[in-house]
Amino acid sequence: MTTPFKRVHLIVMDSVGIGEGPDAKAFDDEGSHTLKHTLEGFEQSLPNLQKLGLGNIEPLPVIDKEVEPQAFYTKMSEASVGKDTMTGHWEIMGLNIMQPFKVYPEGFPEELVNEIETLTGRKVVANRPASGTQIIDEWGEHQMKTGDLIVYTSADPVLQIAAHEDIIPLEELYDICEKVRELTKDPKYLIGRIIARPYIGEPGSFKRTSNRHDYALKPFGRTVMNELKDNGYDVIALGKINDIFDGEGVTESIRTKDNMDGIDKLIETVQRDFNGLSFLNLVDFDALYGHRRDKPGYAQAIKDFDERLSELMNHLQEEDLVIITADHGNDPTADGTDHTREYIPVLMFSPKMTDYHELTIDSTFSSLGATIADNFGVKLPEFGKSYLKEMGVEK
């Protein structure tokens, strides 16, 4: 079957929102605007994002409006009730999540802690939101002496369990995480991911190892990725995409170390011969800068991404379509450390297209999945609509 585009490269700039969503008040996120507030006072230009028309979606500092943008552009609000990474990505791929995952800014409830201790025969310590390196520095020596489980969370719906590899062997830690995964499927907890976080070393020089393992929930329904895979298309997951979807609908998974490594891996993937979807998450915007409210770091990360775009464009083939978007906001100037309920930007371009213009603003991220499904001639998701016709794409 001949498709309009042989390959679609979907890039999610994790948390790079473009202004408060229509229901931001319900999430206490009125006034949030990740891109605008991040770039205020930033003194460097972003020529590639400007050229594509990012400044045409919303007035932004350092990004002027383009008379002839080099991409289709629009923004989308989220239909699902959550503002976390899993919900955003699942909605992009066609699902509408009506029961939000739960976050635990005060730590996990005593009832759950007691259940974990009974289930594992080990005591739980820490039990609060923290960065992984910080919590291991704080509790690592204690864990080595006692064999307790260092349990912590973040602004995302995750439960992380850290243990020294010499004290709790990997297989036991993985077994513990599998048990906790089953336990937290209970709707009263509904935690998105359980993460094993092994570490090594001595007090003062602890180091997390690459033996991390994620135990995610499977998507609550079939996604566009399932449809693509079942119809013989490649679905190449880069970065944490495989974890977000628990491997569902993925034909190949490629790990990345950080944003720049993610772009490297994407460019390598673009240079291969495949037919289908490559799906990249760039997590640093969110994990390193948004949650930590590091506005200068966030702005520089956007600049670094902008600089790599020309390199990516140089490797594109005629039959490629690139989609750049986000999954939620995380305004580094907002109170607290949580995500913000925002519109997401959408930029779509291809070497074989020239007549670019604004697209209709949509009320669900699923229209991205619908566009991808429509391109490859597979079943469209229940939610969202394809943009191909509005883009002037002949099928």
Curated annotation (Swiss-Prot):
Keywords linked to the UniProt accession: Cytoplasm, Isomerase, Manganese, Metal-binding
Family: Belongs to the phosphopentomutase family.
Predominant cellular place of this UniProt entry's protein: cytoplasm
Cofactor(s) needed: Mn(2+)
Protein name: Phosphopentomutase
Residue ranges of the TM segments: none
InterPro entries: Alkaline_phosphatase_core_sf (IPR017850), DeoB (IPR010045), Metalloenzyme (IPR006124), Phosphopentomutase_DeoB_cap_sf (IPR024052)
Lineage start: Bacteria, Bacillati, Bacillota, Bacilli, Bacillales
